[in-house]
Amino acid sequence: MVRKNKINRASGTTKHLKDFPSVILSLPSYNPSILSKNATALITGGSSGLGFELAKELSRRINKVIVADIQSFPTFAQVEYNNIFYYQCDITSLDEIKNLKKAIERDHGNINIIINNAGVAHIKKLEHMTNKEVEQLIDINLIGAYRIISTFAEDMIDNREGFIINIASVLGELTPARLTSYGASKGAMIGFHKCMSRHFRSLSTECNKTGIKTLLVCPGKIKTNMFIDVPTPSKLLAPDIIPSQLALAIISAMEHNHLQTLNAPYYVNLVPFFKTLSWPYRHLLKHFSGMDHVTSTSPRAINPKRSA
């Protein structure tokens, strides 16, 4: 069942974008940004964390923001934003996503921007994970994003315009202890995004059918509830990311038509180099960084937590 709530709007203030590559924030734009148009965005997992910050910031720049989440939108925000619209939707259900599309088309028209942000994490040894837990995690973190794109992208292709953003994680490239299933889902998201982007580019060059832009976001540890009980092993080398700052960096990348990968903070850009090292050196790196220790000693409950 899709349930809609209307959220009221408030004005915002400019925040400083620290810990992000300045080149991304100052790229020249040779094509008009989709944010300069009468756009409507759909954000999954937008009731908290990064998704909530993206919803607030986008509401100040575009016509409408649609939040689709199984969790309710925060009560305190319901009196502050008038162009954010909440729909309750479980992205593991294709029927609910199809009903969501019908409701959005009826109430708001077509979607121009998709941000796949919804996600869950289990901090458990792989052998202690049940099949149901693994299936649920993959269903939300990967297949749910596929369902959203396959359902809404057809209109983007017909209109020859759109922007799709997939939120992955550096843990899809280098995974610490007890996050095997989560790392696998985010690694699969990275691979899916690359294949999807090539597909849309081929449509554009071969058939002139689409102007869909894509952006992959690979952040480090974001300071949200998902990993709230996992301490940062090194605030100097791998600082937590403030969700509001990452949201602004993503929007800046959209404004400048940055169409590759947004890595944040700086150390994420070094991960491809780490992956070229032989396994003994990777093992030593993970040991001295403390990343395995903080996840293996986390008091995390078994139940998953939604939203990045």
From Swiss-Prot:
InterPro entries: NAD(P)-bd_dom_sf, Sc_DH/Rdtase_CS, SDR_fam. It holds the Pfam family adh_short. NADP(+) binds at residues 50, 90, 117, 182, 186, 222, 224. It comes from the Eukaryota. GO terms for molecular function: oxidoreductase activity, acting on the CH-OH group of donors, NAD or NADP as acceptor. Its EC number is 1.-.-.-. This is Uncharacterized oxidoreductase YDL114W. The lineage of its organism: Eukaryota, Fungi, Dikarya, Ascomycota, Saccharomycotina.
